């Protein structure tokens, strides 16, 4: 059992006898009494999103999942295909299951494939991935004074903010939890 106050984005839980992935978890505390934990849960089986409020101190069952190392191969628009590194078995996941993760997938990227009851249900990305900048504004002398950054589009379609010195064609490291630029690769 896991305390609802410890729920984070990406956690897998069992709620009302169905497995859900936590999309969002926000804590709200009132002046008196206990707080509320408002969550958005996505059913791994049906894909439906449910908003659920828990009282602080409640506990939910942690899903019995297993992780296996896999390599991302390709996608055909509807499904993303992965190969287990130990047995070379191939599995596919529907595109709607990988809403945020798809922006970090490049060919041959190693990920953890998440299994529930023997079936793949999701992936866990590495914390940092290397992506190529395909579109950004050119750098001009003197524009670093203001700090901040400029918008950039990466090879997977992810849009992020990069420092002014980053140019088109450069490889950068991106945090998969937030989508933020970390450093040049």
Swiss-Prot record:
Q: Which GO terms describe its molecular function?
A: translation elongation factor activity
GO CC annotations on file = cytoplasm
Q: Which domain of life is it from?
A: Bacteria
Q: Which NCBIfam families does the record cross-reference, listed alphabetically?
A: efp, PRK00529.1
What's its job?
Involved in peptide bond synthesis. Stimulates efficient translation and peptide-bond synthesis on native or reconstituted 70S ribosomes in vitro. Probably functions indirectly by altering the affinity of the ribosome for aminoacyl-tRNA, thus increasing their reactivity as acceptors for peptidyl transferase.
* Family stated for the protein in its record: Belongs to the elongation factor P family.
What name does this protein carry?
Answer: Elongation factor P
The species this protein belongs to is Petrotoga mobilis (strain DSM 10674 / SJ95)
Q: Which gene encodes it?
A: efp
